């Protein structure tokens, strides 16, 4: 007499497999969404760091050179006819007392860094903050991705508000003056960050503007109210 051992094999039913696949796909979708968000946030932060570092470096260069305007000259050194809210031209005689310089260099403004103009140059739908030195290297790009630059002229130190996300300062404590009468300058530069992704997509970063400001005292003027 023979006997048979009955073996039962267990497994997943079709319904269980479908449920497992749905859960797996949901987890993969959530993971890909989080990854897309993280990548776009990182892209925006990298863009912000590069743009702000570029603009801050440009502001530092401008502030240092503007502070020395009018050195060994009558007046504040600002060329009023070539200066305004969006551009600034400054002059200084840096070699006036340099015994090693030529007579022409001591008596005239003909050397590098003595006649400088700052302005916004638009090219290929991009705004560049440029520095022009006719006696030096000509035109140099100080920063790109600049949305707006505004230069304010005052005859005394001022206070103001720099609203986040705006393009210029507000609530200034004193009235502006003409460039030739300025003793104190406020430079405001708006840096626009481009959008990352498409509206409605995971991790979308909308366009955003960051306002950077610098206060410059013209050292070669009598800023009695400073």
Predicted regions span which residues?
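Type IV pilin-like appendage domain
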Residues: 82-168, 207-211
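Aliphatic-rich helix starts adjacent to a transmembrane/signal segment
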Residues: 2-4, 9-71, 223
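N-terminal cationic leader/targeting segments used for protein routing and processing
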Residues: 6-8, 132, 172
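Short linear sequence signals and composition-biased patches located at protein termini or domain-edge surfaces
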Residues: 40, 140-226
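Internal low-complexity, small-residue/proline-rich segments
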Residues: 71-77, 84
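Short, cationic motifs built from Arg/Lys/His that form the positively charged side of catalytic pockets
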Residues: 56, 67, 120, 128-131, ...
């Amino acid at each position: 007499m023979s006997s048979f051992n009955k073996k039962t094999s267990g497994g997943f039913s079709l319904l269980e497999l479908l449920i497992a696949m749905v859960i797996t796909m949901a987890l993969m979708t959530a993971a890909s969404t989080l990854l897309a968000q993280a990548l776009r946030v990182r892209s925006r932060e990298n863009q912000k760091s590069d743009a702000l570092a570029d603009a801050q470096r440009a502001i530092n260069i401008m502030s240092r050179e503007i502070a020395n305007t009018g050195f060994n000259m009558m007046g504040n050194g600002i060329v009023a006819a070539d200066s305004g809210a969006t551009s600034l031209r400054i002059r200084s005689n840096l070699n006036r007392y340099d015994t090693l310089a030529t007579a022409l260099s001591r008596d005239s403004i003909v050397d590098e860094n003595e006649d400088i103009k700052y302005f916004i140059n638009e090219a290929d739908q991009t705004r560049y903050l440029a520095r022009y030195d006719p006696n030096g290297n000509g035109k140099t790009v100080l920063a790109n991705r600049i949305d707006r630059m505004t230069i304010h002229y005052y005859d005394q130190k001022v206070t103001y508000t720099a609203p986040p996300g705006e393009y210029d300062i507000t609530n200034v404590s004193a009235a502006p003056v003409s460039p030739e009468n300025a003793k104190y300058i406020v430079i405001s530069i708006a840096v626009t960050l481009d959008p990352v992704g498409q509206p409605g997509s995971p991790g979308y970063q909308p366009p955003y503007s960051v306002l950077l400001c610098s206060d410059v005292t013209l050292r070669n003027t009598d800023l009695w109210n400073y």
